[in-house]
Amino acid sequence: MNFSINRIVLLDNLSKAAKVIDYKNVNPSLSGIYLNVLNDQVNVITTSGILSFKSILNNQNSDLEVKQEGKVLLKPKYVLEMLRRLDDEFVVFSMVEDNELIIKTNNSDFSIGVLNSEDYPLIGFREKGIEFNLNPKEVKKTIYQVFVSMNENNKKLILTGLNLKLNNNQAIFSTTDSFRISQKILEIQSDNNEDIDITIPFKTALELPKLLDNAENLKIIIVEGYITFIIDNVIFQSNLIDGKFPNVQIAFPTKFETIITVKQKSILKVLSRFDLVADDGLPAIVNIKVNEDKIEFKSFISEVGKYEEDFDDFVIEGNKSLSISFNTRFLIDAIKTLSEDRIELKLINSTKPIVINNVYDEHLKQVILPTFLSN
């Protein structure tokens, strides 16, 4: 095996591949990065068993020149560290026998031990199924916006994931931890007439946005039990979570008694002063009391004290008398996902959830259940 390649491009692809690896896996070969060197391309492959990654490097995207085909199973840590420290534009990878990798530049070379490439499993990447295209920037933004309602440690496995529904030329992304719901709708153009309802694992939702940085194209392929993301020269595949995701749509009220319009930055500043965690680790709870022309924010944190603040920079429609309490951090996280200057806080009464969205765009909605305080 012998090839020359652009160092920065190789480092970028190896770094992305390494993030998929589960270093706790009992199979030692899965802790490596598998390079399959062909006549005109190098395939960079990793897998955790649930997630699988493959990038295709060639002369066009990485100045690749292959002198000898072959394969190698790299130990990521030392190879990545050395590639970061080198200054050369190009590096040459070659093998000595079957257990030693040589990395050369114009002024340096070093050798490093490798794993047995014959032990690496054959990874099947599924590239045929129900297909549709999305804007990678929009998907990246969407995942960050709905990620706030995900909880990797939820006892219900299905609630640890990100639900994706396709119907009526809409892609609906939903998450919930039972206390809050995040939902974002993207418009799509697809020839598919089949409704889709799948749930993507937490780890997949965590890693996918990192692969979408500077991406130009994103194709999504859904086949039974799997979802594949084709991102320019990268194929990112994931198992799906079995089970039925709850119908969160029924939690979205359609009629409200109180609608408060407020500047996003203004209310975030106020709420930040109530976001203090007590010594016992319990989350801060803020009581919001609407009283005609002002909103009273109140909080009492054991071993910290009581804090109150009046707020009048808002416009209100409907019922102007209401008292309701929420987890302060939940409110802050939800409001931060909204991108417009003015947002709406929609309420029914003190026992029903709040719905938060941008004033002029309801494609993103955040729902939070109230917290009930004992006297």
Curated annotation (Swiss-Prot):
Any one Gene Ontology BP term: DNA strand elongation involved in DNA replication
Statement: the UniProt record of this protein carries the keyword Cytoplasm: yes
Keywords: Cytoplasm, DNA replication, DNA-binding, DNA-directed DNA polymerase, Nucleotidyltransferase, Transferase
Taxonomy, superkingdom: Bacteria
Gene Ontology molecular function: 3'-5' exonuclease activity; DNA binding; DNA-directed DNA polymerase activity
Compartment(s): Cytoplasm
Database matches in SUPFAM superfamilies: DNA clamp (SSF55979)
CDD domains per the UniProt record, alphabetical: beta_clamp
This protein's record includes keyword Transferase: yes
A GO CC term attached to the entry: cytoplasm
SMART domains: POL3Bc
Assembly: Forms a ring-shaped head-to-tail homodimer around DNA which binds and tethers DNA polymerases and other proteins to the DNA. The DNA replisome complex has a single clamp-loading complex (3 tau and 1 each of delta, delta', psi and chi subunits) which binds 3 Pol III cores (1 core on the leading strand and 2 on the lagging strand) each with a beta sliding clamp dimer. Additional proteins in the replisome are other copies of gamma, psi and chi, Ssb, DNA helicase and RNA primase.
Family membership noted in the UniProt record: Belongs to the beta sliding clamp family.
Described purpose of this protein according to its UniProt entry: Confers DNA tethering and processivity to DNA polymerases and other proteins. Acts as a clamp, forming a ring around DNA (a reaction catalyzed by the clamp-loading complex) which diffuses in an ATP-independent manner freely and bidirectionally along dsDNA. Initially characterized for its ability to contact the catalytic subunit of DNA polymerase III (Pol III), a complex, multichain enzyme responsible for most of the replicative synthesis in bacteria; Pol III exhibits 3'-5' exonuclease proofreading activity.
NCBIfam families for this protein: dnan (TIGR00663), PRK05643.3-2 (NF004184)
Name the UniProt record assigns to this protein: Beta sliding clamp
Organism: Mycoplasma capricolum subsp. capricolum (strain California kid / ATCC 27343 / NCTC 10154)
Encoding gene, per UniProt annotation: dnaN
